[in-house]
């Protein structure tokens, strides 16, 4: 397969079958492309079939193997049926990436109990449903690797208390499952916690938030935000044999931003407003290599401008 330029060995996931929930857009789409470029048979699943179909077609045009299947992760019965369908078609399910989820910006004082419960149900309960389905449908007898996409929330999550609570629950659940399921043929369960990432998810932000985000990317040790490819690469590492002795961890992929709070002089004086000296990893092909005109990131123009800037220093 040509097209997506992964930093990993091209046949790393040959003969592996990987389910990526929320795989039609944003970070999930990038994870699917990276895994397919490494030889995996990828199944992407979400509620909206049109987005899944478009991504699956992209991957197949590049020579990869990808199926699109619809799922509501809040339905535990449907989650198990999805896993069973994958095993029936492909004979196995060796890896699961729980990327599906969602939230909205709201201060806790304005958040209804229904809104809180809805986000917790989708993110926390939905992730458990998929983990349990993978265990019951295949991994309990054969082993496997699971990566849950969460968020860096150790210091709270202002304006998103619902997703902060849910993601914290997933992190604890991940550690618990790593202990309980490790004896079942070596199942490994880990988390990846992205920092601020240049992705299509930023389309959901109000314009005022996009304006602030687009002008403050330098206020961290890395001097920039992350790329979808950097999250995808972290997931690939944790799924791969290179992480065979890693289980129960929450890997923060945030350029050190979660460690950089509390400067007495303020972040404005601690970091370099001229930009980043940390090269970015961007796997999307460019120029003459982008023969299928793959769209890199479907984000607001100001966010796309940031990605263009990061590409100039990419690895």
Sequence positions of predicted segments:
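Catalytic loop of short-chain dehydrogenase/reductase
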Residues: 147-169, 174-183, 196-197, 257
